[in-house]
């Protein structure tokens, strides 16, 4: 597998070593071997809300270091136009539509998430990796 887009919830599970999902997710990442993982600016935005709200500079730094391990996936205007199509056709929330559109734009082989709703709209691209 080539490039895998990581949804924000998964990056949060990794950074905060989620009690239920942290270890299974780390194992799933280790199992794919040669794959690269990518994140968008939207993922970074969603992830940083918690540490900023709590005023936790240590966790902010942990996120920043984790972000550096992933390929950055830009979100140019065509991503937003595709997201509008996805919202119109599948009723996705704006952030979910943007995640999916970004993964499609960059030709990702998969979009890993913990959200079953994305799987229906993605025609097999998105999958709940923790299900």
Predicted regions and their residues:
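Short, well-structured N-terminal submotif of metal-dependent ribonuclease cores
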Residues: 1-39, 51-62, 130-131
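Conserved SAM-binding loop
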Residues: 14, 72, 92, 111
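Active-site charged/polar residues at nucleotide-handling catalytic sites that mediate phosphoryl
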Residues: 32, 90, 106
């Amino acid at each position: 597998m080539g490039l895998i887009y990581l949804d924000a919830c998964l990056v949060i599970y990794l950074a905060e070593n989620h009690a239920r999902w942290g270890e299974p997710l780390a194992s799933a990442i280790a199992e794919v071997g040669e794959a690269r993982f990518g994140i968008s600016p939207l993922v970074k935005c969603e992830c940083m809300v918690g540490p900023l709200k709590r005023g936790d500079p240590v966790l902010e730094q942990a996120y920043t270091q984790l972000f550096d391990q992933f390929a950055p996936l830009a979100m140019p205007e065509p991503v937003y136009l595709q997201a509008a199509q996805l919202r119109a056709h599948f009723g996705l929330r704006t952030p979910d539509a943007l995640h999916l559109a970004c993964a499609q734009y960059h030709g990702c082989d998969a979009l890993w998430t913990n959200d079953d709703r994305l799987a229906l709209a993605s025609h097999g691209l998105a999958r709940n990796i923790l299900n």
